[in-house]
Protein backbone atom coordinates (compact mmCIF):
# COMPACT_ATOMS: atom_id res chain seq x y z
CA UNK A 1 0.00 0.00 0.00
CA UNK A 2 1.27 3.46 -0.82
CA UNK A 3 1.83 5.99 1.95
CA UNK A 4 -0.97 8.19 0.62
CA UNK A 5 -3.41 5.27 0.69
CA UNK A 6 -2.24 4.22 4.14
CA UNK A 7 -2.79 7.74 5.49
CA UNK A 8 -6.29 7.74 4.00
CA UNK A 9 -7.12 4.38 5.62
CA UNK A 10 -5.86 5.64 9.01
CA UNK A 11 -7.97 8.77 8.65
CA UNK A 12 -11.09 6.69 7.96
CA UNK A 13 -10.33 4.39 10.91
CA UNK A 14 -10.05 7.41 13.24
CA UNK A 15 -13.43 8.67 12.04
CA UNK A 16 -14.98 5.26 12.66
CA UNK A 17 -13.49 5.18 16.16
CA UNK A 18 -14.88 8.67 16.92
CA UNK A 19 -18.34 7.66 15.69
CA UNK A 20 -18.23 4.49 17.79
CA UNK A 21 -17.27 6.52 20.86
CA UNK A 22 -20.16 8.92 20.27
CA UNK A 23 -22.63 6.06 19.96
CA UNK A 24 -21.39 4.52 23.21
CA UNK A 25 -21.58 7.86 25.04
CA UNK A 26 -24.94 7.20 26.70
CA UNK A 27 -26.71 9.88 28.66
CA UNK A 28 -27.81 9.66 32.27
CA UNK A 29 -29.73 11.79 34.74
CA UNK A 30 -27.82 12.98 37.80
CA UNK A 31 -28.70 14.72 41.03
CA UNK A 32 -25.81 16.32 42.88
CA UNK A 33 -26.09 17.38 46.51
CA UNK A 34 -23.22 19.11 48.25
CA UNK A 35 -22.16 20.37 51.65
CA UNK A 36 -18.92 22.31 51.27
CA UNK A 37 -17.02 24.89 53.28
CA UNK A 38 -18.51 28.37 52.87
CA UNK A 39 -15.28 29.53 51.18
CA UNK A 40 -15.95 27.09 48.29
CA UNK A 41 -19.75 27.36 47.97
CA UNK A 42 -19.70 29.99 45.20
CA UNK A 43 -17.03 28.11 43.24
CA UNK A 44 -18.91 24.82 43.28
CA UNK A 45 -22.25 26.51 42.59
CA UNK A 46 -20.84 28.46 39.61
CA UNK A 47 -19.18 25.34 38.23
CA UNK A 48 -22.31 23.18 38.50
CA UNK A 49 -24.52 25.90 36.94
CA UNK A 50 -22.50 25.46 33.74
CA UNK A 51 -23.54 21.80 33.50
CA UNK A 52 -26.78 21.23 35.40
CA UNK A 53 -30.01 22.89 36.56
CA UNK A 54 -30.04 24.53 39.97
CA UNK A 55 -32.94 23.12 42.00
CA UNK A 56 -32.44 24.66 45.43
CA UNK A 57 -29.63 25.42 47.85
CA UNK A 58 -26.84 22.87 47.33
CA UNK A 59 -28.84 20.75 44.84
CA UNK A 60 -28.37 20.45 41.07
CA UNK A 61 -29.81 17.99 38.57
CA UNK A 62 -29.95 17.31 34.87
CA UNK A 63 -29.19 15.06 31.92
CA UNK A 64 -25.53 14.57 31.00
CA UNK A 65 -23.46 12.28 28.83
CA UNK A 66 -20.93 9.91 30.36
CA UNK A 67 -18.13 12.18 29.14
CA UNK A 68 -19.73 15.27 30.65
CA UNK A 69 -20.34 13.37 33.88
CA UNK A 70 -16.62 12.59 34.11
CA UNK A 71 -15.78 16.26 33.47
CA UNK A 72 -18.20 17.28 36.22
CA UNK A 73 -16.65 14.84 38.71
CA UNK A 74 -13.14 16.01 37.82
CA UNK A 75 -14.20 19.65 38.22
CA UNK A 76 -15.77 18.97 41.60
CA UNK A 77 -12.64 17.19 42.80
CA UNK A 78 -10.53 20.19 41.78
CA UNK A 79 -12.73 22.52 43.84
CA UNK A 80 -13.48 20.62 47.04
CA UNK A 81 -11.33 19.64 49.97
CA UNK A 82 -11.99 15.89 50.27
CA UNK A 83 -11.11 15.97 53.98
CA UNK A 84 -13.67 18.68 54.74
CA UNK A 85 -16.39 18.74 52.05
CA UNK A 86 -19.07 16.27 50.99
CA UNK A 87 -20.65 15.80 47.56
CA UNK A 88 -23.24 13.10 46.87
CA UNK A 89 -24.04 12.17 43.27
CA UNK A 90 -27.11 10.11 42.39
CA UNK A 91 -27.01 8.58 38.89
CA UNK A 92 -30.07 7.29 37.05
CA UNK A 93 -30.40 5.73 33.61
CA UNK A 94 -32.64 7.83 31.36
CA UNK A 95 -35.26 5.08 31.21
CA UNK A 96 -35.67 5.23 35.02
CA UNK A 97 -38.47 7.65 35.94
CA UNK A 98 -38.50 8.50 39.66
CA UNK A 99 -41.41 10.48 41.04
CA UNK A 100 -40.51 14.01 42.13
CA UNK A 101 -42.66 15.59 44.81
CA UNK A 102 -42.06 19.05 46.26
CA UNK A 103 -43.37 19.98 49.68
CA UNK A 104 -43.44 23.71 50.34
CA UNK A 105 -41.88 26.33 48.11
CA UNK A 106 -40.27 25.24 44.84
CA UNK A 107 -37.10 27.34 44.68
CA UNK A 108 -36.40 27.04 40.94
CA UNK A 109 -39.16 25.50 38.79
CA UNK A 110 -37.83 23.55 35.81
CA UNK A 111 -40.16 22.43 33.03
CA UNK A 112 -38.14 19.48 31.75
CA UNK A 113 -37.50 17.46 34.90
CA UNK A 114 -37.54 13.67 34.66
Curated annotation (Swiss-Prot):
UniProt keywords, alphabetically: Antiviral defense, Endonuclease, Hydrolase, Magnesium, Metal-binding, Nuclease
Entry binding sites for Mg(2+): 35
Needed cofactors: Mg(2+)
EC number(s) on file: 3.1.-.-
Pfam families reported in the protein's UniProt record: CRISPR_Cas2
GO molecular function ontology, one term from the record: RNA endonuclease activity
UniProt keyword Magnesium, yes or no: yes
GO biological process, any: maintenance of CRISPR repeat elements
Family annotation (InterPro entries): CRISPR_associated_Cas2, Virulence_VapD/CRISPR_Cas2
EC category name: hydrolase
NCBIfam families xrefs: cas2
Quaternary context: Homodimer, forms a heterotetramer with a Cas1 homodimer.
Job description of the protein: CRISPR (clustered regularly interspaced short palindromic repeat), is an adaptive immune system that provides protection against mobile genetic elements (viruses, transposable elements and conjugative plasmids). CRISPR clusters contain sequences complementary to antecedent mobile elements and target invading nucleic acids. CRISPR clusters are transcribed and processed into CRISPR RNA (crRNA). Functions as a ssRNA-specific endoribonuclease. Involved in the integration of spacer DNA into the CRISPR cassette.
PANTHER family xref list: CRISPR-ASSOCIATED ENDORIBONUCLEASE CAS2
Recorded family membership: Belongs to the CRISPR-associated endoribonuclease Cas2 protein family.
Protein name: CRISPR-associated endoribonuclease Cas2
Organism: Methanocaldococcus jannaschii (strain ATCC 43067 / DSM 2661 / JAL-1 / JCM 10045 / NBRC 100440) (Methanococcus jannaschii)
Gene of this entry: cas2
Amino acid sequence: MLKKEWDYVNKILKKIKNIRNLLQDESMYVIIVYDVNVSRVNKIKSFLRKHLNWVQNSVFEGEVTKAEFERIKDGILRIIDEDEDSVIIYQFPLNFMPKREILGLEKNPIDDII
